[in-house]
Curated annotation (Swiss-Prot):
Membrane topology listed for this record: Multi-pass membrane protein
Assigned protein family: Belongs to the TVP38/TMEM64 family.
Organism of origin: Mycobacterium bovis (strain ATCC BAA-935 / AF2122/97)
Flavoprotein in keyword set: no
Protein name listed in UniProt: TVP38/TMEM64 family membrane protein Mb1528c
Keyword Electron transport: no
Classification via Pfam families: VTT_dom
Keywords assigned: Cell membrane, Membrane, Transmembrane, Transmembrane helix
InterPro entries: TMEM64, VTT_dom
Transmembrane segments: 32-52, 64-84, 88-108, 149-169, 177-197, 209-229
Coiled coil: none
Record localization: Cell membrane
C-alpha cells in the first residue's frame, strides 16, 4: 500500500471518528442510554451463551433427523445477530454437513444474520444522515447508497474486520439493503468456504488452505477499500463547504 493511500485511509478513518463523536454529542440522552444498555445486553448474551460441543451437535442432529439442517440454519442466524463468534457455527457446518451443504448453510445463515442486525440498527433510528447535519456526511451517505456494495464487499473479504461491526455500521449508513445482502454473501463466500473445509477436515474429508485464502482475500479486500476511498476523496475533497454543517436542525 502506498504512502498516499495510507494517508488517505487514515484521514478517512479520522473523519469517521469525528462524525461518530458528533453523533454522540447531538443524540438525546435516552437514546444514548438505550443504546449502551442494548449493546451491553448483546455482549453479555454473546459471552454467556454456551458453545455446543461436537458431541452435543451430533446428538441434536440425531434427535431432529431431516429437520436438523433447517434448525441449524435458524439457530445460526439468530445467535449471530449479537456479536457472537460465528466461527463455531461455520466449523460445525463443515463437520456436520460436509463441504457443499456446509458452505451453503454457513453463508446463508451469516448473510441473513447480517441483514437482521442491519435492520435492527435502522429500526432504532441510529442513522448518521439524520443525526449529523454535515455536507461531508450527506455526501458520504449518498455515496454509500449508490456504491456501498463495494465497501461492504471489500470489508467482508478482510478476515480481521469484525462481522458484527460491519453489520451495525452499515445499518447507520445509507447502504441499500439488497446491495448489502449481495455484497455480504459474495464477500463471506471465500473465507467461509475455507473455514467450512477446515471443519470438514476434522472429519477426515478435506485439506484446507485457510491461511493462504485469508491472506489473498484480505489483500483483495484492502485493495478494493483503498480504491474506493481514494476515488471518493478525489471526487469530493475539493468541493466547497465539504465539511460545513447544514443549517437544518438534526432530527433526534
Amino acid at each position: 500500500m502506498t504512502a498516499p493511500a495510507i494517508c488517505n485511509t487514515t484521514e478517512t478513518v479520522h473523519g469517521i471518528a469525528t462524525s461518530l463523536g458528533a453523533v454522540a454529542r447531538q443524540a438525546s440522552l435516552p437514546r444514548i442510554v438505550g443504546t449502551v444498555v442494548g449493546i451491553t445486553v448483546l455482549v453479555v448474551v454473546a459471552l454467556l451463551v454456551p458453545v455446543p460441543t461436537a458431541v452435543e451437535l451430533r446428538d441434536w442432529a440425531k434427535s431432529l433427523g431431516a429437520w436438523f439442517p433447517l434448525a441449524f440454519l435458524l439457530v445460526h442466524t439468530v445467535v449471530t445477530v449479537p456479536p457472537f463468534p460465528r466461527t463455531a457455527f461455520t466449523l460445525a457446518a463443515g463437520l456436520l454437513f460436509g463441504s457443499v451443504v456446509g458452505v451453503f448453510i454457513a453463508v446463508v445463515g451469516s448473510t441473513a444474520s447480517a441483514v437482521i442486525a442491519m435492520l435492527l440498527v435502522r429500526a432504532t433510528g441510529w442513522q448518521l444522515n439524520s443525526l449529523v447535519r454535515r455536507r461531508a456526511i450527506n455526501r458520504l451517505d449518498e455515496r454509500l447508497r449508490e456504491r456501498g456494495w463495494l465497501a461492504i464487499l471489500s470489508l467482508r473479504l478482510i478476515p480481521v474486520v469484525p462481522f458484527a461491526a460491519i453489520n451495525y455500521a452499515a445499518g447507520a449508513s445509507g447502504v441499500r439493503i439488497l446491495s448489502f445482502a449481495w455484497a455480504t454473501l459474495a464477500g463471506l463466500l471465500p473465507g467461509t468456504a475455507a473455514v467450512v473445509i477446515l471443519g470438514d477436515a476434522f472429519a477426515g474429508s478435506g485439506s484446507p488452505l485457510l491461511i493462504l485464502v485469508s491472506v489473498c482475500t484480505g489483500a483483495l479486500g484492502l485493495t478494493g477499500l483503498v480504491y474506493e476511498i481514494r476515488n471518493y476523496r478525489r471526487q469530493h475533497r475539493r468541493m466547497p463547504g465539504y465539511d460545513d454543517p447544514v443549517r437544518e436542525p438534526a432530527l433526534i
